Amino acid sequence: MSINVFWFLPTHGDGHYLGSSEGARAVDYSYLQQIAQAADRLGFGGVLIPTGRSCEDSWLVAASLIPVTQRLKFLVALRPGIISPTLAARQAATLDRLSNGRALFNLVTGGDPEELAAEGLHLNHTERYEASAEFTHVWRKVLEGETVDFAGKHIQVKGAKLLFPPVQHPRPPLYFGGSSAAAQDLAAEQVELYLTWGETPEQVKEKIEEVRAKAAAKGRTVRFGIRLHVIVRETTEEAWRAANRLIANLDDKTIADAQQAFARFDSVGQQRMAALHGGKKDNLEISPNLWAGVGLVRGGAGTALVGDGPTVAQRIQEYADLGIDTFVFSGYPHLEEAYRVSELLFPHLDLATTELPTQRPATQPQGEVVANIYVPQKVSQS
């Protein structure tokens, strides 16, 4: 089975060491452009752009990189409860049109109540998933060309519609990750690809089976993806030295402070990530070649595959055998590691070819919208 491999744009910072200013790098637009163009040239299918108050805005970053890339797809965040689904659908269609079908969307419910409150979202975990389900229903229908009336507990719209459709038909794919039962229910019912953070193959297998069964009960099928860091070198010994060097400047206080901050999250996925290492720097290899050191101070994806190219490829195949077809990778620093992954790992993988959609007629020349209501149609000649 061919696999899709994405890279990552570090809009929240980059460097040679975790939790330290030593070896840090200025992450400005020129640097992000370098990474995006490298990923484009090296054969990555797309890039994940992170979201949250610690990051640059993912939509603006993606839009700015469209003209300087050719085939690279952009996986950007949808934030239910922070933006209306109708506006989000219009923005999604615009990004898809501007990029000629290179837009992908990642539904992010959020897991930090403190950050969400700062955004104006004051819902508990259960309510956020209720709102996310309603948001996604409206967003999908509007993008698919329907005129939507919807009266839910959290979302109410009347006459929501889209005048300018996306390039991808019926709409761009929707990605989503979450480990709670509510998250799995949402994935089974409404998304195209369910993402998991890099847990052990046994844990990932269990999650896939649960989501697959829930989707089947609704008459649907769901694709699967995984989010991991990668530390690949010419030898496995060298790769492990690089992993240990990445956390060489971490002290116990920095780790404890980070884990205390993560403890306030109500994200089940973040809790599962934290349980893999317990806040300790010893015994970080939690499964063969799967290292939990990144999660000592980094929220979200906290594990890395470590080894030489053939070894890492073997571990990737183990996940692929579970049904995963999309791998979202990253590494520190992200520019150099993109090249290492391409040179040392890609030769051992069966990579999917990036296919771009042909332009739909709706993206061709048209007259100005009449009274902000409809697009004038070409009159047929009799």
Swiss-Prot record:
The record's GO molecular-function terms, alphabetically, read: alkanesulfonate monooxygenase activity
Alphabetized, the UniProt keywords read: Flavoprotein, FMN, Monooxygenase, Oxidoreductase
Q: Which Gene3D superfamilies match?
A: Luciferase-like domain
Catalysed reactions listed for this entry:
an alkanesulfonate + FMNH2 + O2 = an aldehyde + FMN + sulfite + H2O + 2 H(+)
Assigned EC number = 1.14.14.5
Disulphide linkage map: none
Is-annotated flag, keyword RNA-binding? no
Which residues span the membrane? none
Biological process terms from the Gene Ontology for this record are: alkanesulfonate catabolic process
Which leading EC class covers this enzyme? oxidoreductase
The protein's job, in short, is:
Catalyzes the desulfonation of aliphatic sulfonates.
Miscellaneous comment as given in the Swiss-Prot or TrEMBL entry: FMNH(2) which is absolutely required for this enzymatic reaction, is provided by SsuE.
Question: What does the sequence similarity comment in the record state about its family?
Answer: Belongs to the SsuD family.
Q: How does it assemble?
A: Homotetramer.
Q: What is this protein called?
A: Alkanesulfonate monooxygenase
Gene name for this UniProt entry: ssuD
